Amino acid sequence: MLDDLLHVANAIWVGAGTPVAERCIALAKAGEWEQLARLRVVPGDYKLWHDYKVDAQCVDLLRKCEDLPTGIDLEGVAKTAFLQSESLCCHTNAYFSRFINMGPFGPGDARRLEFISKVREEVQRIVGLPPKRLDFRLGKGGTLSDPGMNSTVPHKFCSEPTITPSALHVLPQWAQTAWARNLEPDVLIQLIDYDRWDSVAKDALKNRGISIQPSINIAAQLAVGKFLRRRLKAQGIDLDTRQEMHRFLARIASVDGSLATVDLSNASDTVAKRVVQILFSLEWFQLLNSLRVPTTKFDKKKETGRLYLEKFSGMGNGYTFELETIIFLAISRAVCGLEDVSVYGDDIIVPTEHVGSVLLALRFFGFSPSPAKTFVDGNFRESCGGDYFSGHAVRSHYQENDCTSPQDWISMANGLRRVWLVDGTDMLDSVVTKAWHLCLEKIPVEIRACRGPEILGDIVIHDAPWNWLSRRKDSIRYFRAWLPYTFEVVEWARFPAGAVLAAALYGVSSNQDNSFRLFGIRTSEGRPSKA
């Protein structure tokens, strides 16, 4: 396990030839995987961008590899972080209760109330009035009604819907949807008062906690999230394009230092109930609160062990991302004014001159800025997956899994090339040249011939144009590609007629053989397409 991947990793470490790289080699040789995953470099310790990029790649390469045998209970770490966030939210709720109940007050509370009022006014300016009608939407993931593979649109349209008692007021609107109208007569709505906690892979040291919601709740939450997204766009914050803008701003700030990039630890899990209550109008709070789920359950096999939540919402709730964006935007604007503030989730960019006050304000509302991912001075900035040192992109390639198939090796080779191309050329940096060729050596010769541009993704090996294998016909260029996926299809006949009609009205496309594509499965029987 991992032998071939470690062979490639070792080539990168040897190619780097720095003390940090030597430390990585020593830890890997000793099997100290947890120490290897915890190894970090600090941008402030470097004067030259390339020196930092080399060492960062050395320590980052396997940091997110879920197959790294660290021996850590990844789900246990995620659960501990969840409970710690709940404890923090409990303290935040207790602190803000006196502002909601209007006393008892202490010294300095008049100024705090004034600032809370300023943030609240900014929130109200952003969100306006609540929507009168909800445009129910389905998410891509599972719900309490639709676990695992049974989470496609038609599956959701014929399962037993679930809803919390507090959300029953949306049923008259939901009843007008094709989903509700076409349910089978014997399908009943199930009342439920909890969500289910689960975790998904994040890196080699921990998982990320998520919550699985009741099906009608999540559909209504997504409707509210869509409405809030439109309100943010009206304020100049287009969440559909904001990541690219943040990366641009981070690059500029790494050169002139005019902006600071702020990142929060466990942001969505630390939005406390009382913070939302005090910052949003009564009408908005009642709507948001009615659609959230008040308790969570850790063990899906047991009815006991539920936890009454101190946080307002977390990952899995359909409006959490928009909600936290609005809160952080309002706090930042209350400090800095309307200009030069940009927020995308918990990625915050503010003028450097105001960042100290913004950090104090965030802490006041119970949030925890991450010291390791907040950059105020120096030549480094990070935001929305973009790392920049003096204007140069220095983001590492993260190998998230072991390489066990040609597709894995193509993906790793492409990842290294994407990060390590010398600016303005088709040449690889010498640090990873050997590692890139080792990746290609792991790929069968017939598949190795599939070369093409980056825009095609990992169905080709990204390479210089003169190495592409392609042909032109009728002004269309065809590339030889590796297609290792087959797509399982499901016959529409498996579903009740009402669910099929509702899915068609929702926009699910159908194949010519009266089936629809379910999901892709990587197979070892894939073969290169003809150019």
Where on the chain are the PLM-derived regions?
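Core nucleotidyl-transferase/polymerase catalytic module
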Residues: 1-7, 178-345, 349-531
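C-terminal, non-catalytic extensions of nucleic-acid polymerases
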Residues: 1-207, 357, 421-531
